Each structure stands twice: as C-alpha cells, then as structure tokens.
C-alpha cells in the first residue's frame, strides 16, 4: 500500500464503472470523482482518514484503493473501512492482502479499537472478504449509500486489539 497521492485520480476513474459500482449505487459523475479524490487528500491531512492506493507486482499502475476513516457507530468511536480492486485484478487475493495491511496500519497508528465494514448483504465477494480477513459478523443494518439510496448491509467488525497485541514484542 502507498499513501493516497495527488496523482491518484485515475485510480478512482478506473473504479467508476457499472460493474465496479453495482453495489454502490452505480457510477459517479466526473465531478463526484474529482470531489472524492480531493476528499481523500484532505482527510489524510486532517488525520480523519487514511486512504491508500493498492500496488501489485502484476501491474505498473495502482490496481485499486483501500482505506479507513473515523466514524461514530452505535455510540462508539470506531473506524469504517472500504476498498475497491479493479476488475482485471480481482480473484487473486489482492483485496485480502490490501485489507489486512490496511487493518495493520490502523492497529499500529490509530487510536480506535474497532473497524467496521458494511458491504451490502447481497455482495457475496465483499462479505467473503470480510470473513476471510478475520472480521466478525455482528448482524445487519440499514444504510443509505449513496445518500438517499437505502440499502441493507452486513455489519462486520474487526477488533484491532488482536493485531496490536500480536505486533508488539512480549514484555519480560
């Protein structure tokens, strides 16, 4: 993973296809993509999010994005995570490796204990990714994404404390 950079707008543009956004309400306008890119950069500067471009040895350009951001959920301060791996690079374990690395980053540098993911209940690939990456299914929830578009999601939770305890040396 590499920190989101000013030159990463094409990563979002390549993710903005009908196939890639079927569970996200469909493609965004060009202006919405530019706004999202600016938001990724701004949120990194403010410390409210950490967005990354995903690199793969099999491609010269980034193959997607992953990140986490601060969220208030069920009266707790948590992180939410999201990801996107370009169609040609799906099915090769890239998303699982990127999400695991993203979670480790949150554990190493973040100040919250839980990360949540909210894939639509019918998004079998993203739900399988959550399961495979070690998230626990907490239930279902009603969401709006994009705003004004109600969806039903699975509520997956990952406890960062497990990563923190395994990545720190044992005390004598």
Predicted regions mapped to residue ranges:
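Conserved GNAT-fold acetyl-CoA-binding loop/helix
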Residues: 20-39, 50
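Acyl-donor (CoA/ACP) binding surface of acyl/acetyltransferases
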Residues: 1-18, 22, 51-172
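Short loop/turn motifs at secondary-structure junctions and domain boundaries
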Residues: 42-48
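Short, P/G- and charge-enriched loop/turn segments at secondary-structure junctions
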Residues: 39-42, 144
């Amino acid at each position: 993973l590499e920190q989101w950079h000013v030159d990463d707008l094409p990563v979002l543009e390549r993710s903005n296809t009908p196939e890639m956004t079927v569970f996200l309400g469909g493609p965004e306008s060009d202006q919405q993509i530019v706004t999202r890119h600016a938001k990724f950069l701004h949120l990194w500067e403010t410390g409210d999010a950490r967005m990354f471009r995903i690199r793969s040895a099999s491609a010269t350009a980034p193959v997607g994005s992953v990140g986490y951001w601060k969220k208030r959920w069920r009266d707790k301060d948590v992180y939410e995570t999201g990801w996107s791996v370009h169609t040609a690079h799906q099915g090769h374990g890239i998303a699982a490796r990127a999400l695991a690395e993203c979670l480790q980053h949150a554990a190493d540098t973040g100040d919250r204990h839980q990360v949540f993911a909210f894939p639509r209940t019918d998004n079998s690939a993203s739900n399988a990714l959550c399961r495979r990456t070690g998230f626990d299914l907490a239930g279902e929830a009603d969401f709006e994404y994009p705003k004004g578009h109600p969806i039903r999601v699975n509520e997956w939770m990952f406890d960062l404390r497990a990563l923190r305890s395994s990545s720190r040396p044992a005390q004598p």
